[in-house]
Amino acid sequence: MNFTTLIAKKFMFNKKHIGPSRLTGLIAIIGISLGTMAMILSVSVLNGFESKIIDKIVGFEGDIKLGGDIEFEKSMQILSSIDEVENFIPYVERVGLIMNQYNESRMIAFKSIDISKVKSFYQIDFIESADFDLPMIYLGRTTAARLNLQVGDKVRLLSPLDQNIVWGLPRSLEVIIGGIFDVQILDFNDKVVFIPEDIGKKLFLRKKGFDGIDIKTGEHSNLKNIKKVIQQKINNSHIETWSEIHENLFSAMRL
């Protein structure tokens, strides 16, 4: 029996001190026990909540983002040779407008990727999806709600930054909504629209190459070590892990 347990028993079960002091001690012990239990439960809930947020972020963005003044074709060959890298997908990003049939529009970031990989690479919950003959795009639930859009609706994508110099009109292309996703954290549901590569090339006339590469690693990989390996093999690269990109969010959660 340790010293603290011995003192507690002497205090609680000493027959010479039956009365208010014993009752007060019992209430104090119960109070401390309940407080400790509540703290343990709160920490457990927060840890579980943090874990879910991490899964959502990694599922939407990947483990690592690679960018910078690099040769993307050569960089992708290098990534293929790194054992810890399970998968990657290059992308082009551009802020533009999405417009519904009533000419209501919303400014949003277009992410041009190999659209056939949107469901296999990104771990996103789709509340609706379907296949169509027209080029398909995928957008968030909030964006769809604000523009009153559903799967199968036709919309127009416009890129004001790539407007025709002669006519002064932005490039515009018609596509169809192939899926609506629901990420449920941050502003992801109203932040990005995934569009096909060929649509991106037609829309972003002033873009000359990729903007970055989303990278997926193994489940228990050491991201810091993988980041160092990539930096050593790819010159002039700018690399960020998911924790670095969202450092402020998780710092605030841990306060």
Q: Language-model segments: what does each one mean?
A:
Residues D63-K65, M136, G212-D214:
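Short aromatic/hydrophobic contact patches that present stacked aromatics
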Residues R22-I29, V45, K56, A109, ...:
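Residue-level recognition of specific faces of alpha-helices
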Residues M1-T36:
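N-terminal Sec/SRP start-transfer signal
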Residues M37-A109, S129-D133, Q231, H238:
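Hydrophobic, regular-secondary-structure patches
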Residues F11-K15, K56, F60, L158, ...:
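Conserved, well-folded catalytic cores of nucleic-acid-processing
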Residues L169-L255:
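Mechanotransmission and gating elements of multispan inner-membrane complexes involved in transport
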